[in-house]
Amino acid sequence: MERYGSITTPVSVPRLIVGAMLAAGVAVLILAFTQYGLLAGLAVSVIPAALCILWVTLRNPAISMLGLFVVNYFIMALTRYAHDLPFGMILDALIFYNFLIITLQALIRPIEWKRASSGLTVVAAIWMAYCILEIVNPESVSVAGWFSSVRSIAFYFFFIVVLTQLTMTEYKYLKYMLAVWSVLTLIAVGKACMQKFFGFNAAENYWLFVLGGRSTHIIHSGVRYFSFFSDAANFGGSMGLSMVVFSISALYYRNSWMKLYLLLVAAAACYGMLISGTRSALAVPFVGYSAFIMMSRNIKMIGAGVFLIIAAFIFLKFTTIGQGNSIIRRARSAFNTNDPSFQVRLANQAKLRELMADKPFGAGLGHGGGKAKTFAPNAALSQIPTDSWFVMVWVETGVVGILLHIGILLYILARGAYLVVFKLRNTQLRGF
């Protein structure tokens, strides 16, 4: 006899009871619309859909995680259209919902909690603890600033690490995630193409010309397209990652149509990365492909890969071929140390070094870059753009924080490489 029951076990319900429940539901819906108005009626009408979602995610928590993945992909776009909605709270609620689903699952069937007791969880917890302690940073002048940043910079990292290990427990879920991710990538590139060929919509124009996005997205070298991401830097970096993941995945899919589809997605992502005008995004494919080549341990692949990477570098760094094309010209500027925008970044970092000299633990979470003007409008650090993620982490958490952050990333890279090279036996999952 099974010790644990199953929420997927079919249940026989008399048709009379089903009919009575449906009739009662319709009656409640009509009452809500007629007596309490449109909003009440709409609220009642979504209850069946909510119950269906609850049932489906209880049966398979991985679906709930994929839902969180999709919502997180689009949440940045929604902030551009509805400024007053608490979108951070939406992500908080969805993360809480995923933990609730796992907790309910544990009441019915055993959960392998030990899956979450990995080194990745430990380093994520260390980073979260450091960021929590930033609340007592003497340089910080606003608890609200700390609270606004600690969730995205620390809490989400830790919670997603734990949830992923507890829910994405089978190889098929990785395939599902790749499929969903590929569709999201195509949508993102499609939106960027709409911006390029048809122009920006009213909300995007407001962000560009009223809220100040123009200064960094309509520049001397052309327009930097950002799709529905928060800015072109995030869009370009995301597309660079998508390009690497899907091009490598295409090599090891047995289905020819799937290979072709993934290559097309990778090509679309490459185009999206280029039209974003984000020079730093070019580092993603260079580093990603280099890491893959080094781990492959295949002499032919190493030789071909090294040749292609060097050829691409020489093409962009030492030639002027295709210089008349704005996309190639902008990509080539990533290797030009005399580029005006690069010089501006260096100047900003020089100013930041002077201000950060006596702040080993940083200025406090939420106190770096333009967003800091909300909490410390007159602070010197609030007037200088951070320009990149790593500079922002350095400014907000100090040299101690940035060294810890980089150390954690290097650990994740090294541990992941070790597992892929020496532990995985599935060639399709391993990638070589």
Language-model regions: role of each:
Residues 219, 323-397, 418-423:
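Long extracytoplasmic/lumenal interhelical loops at the membrane interface
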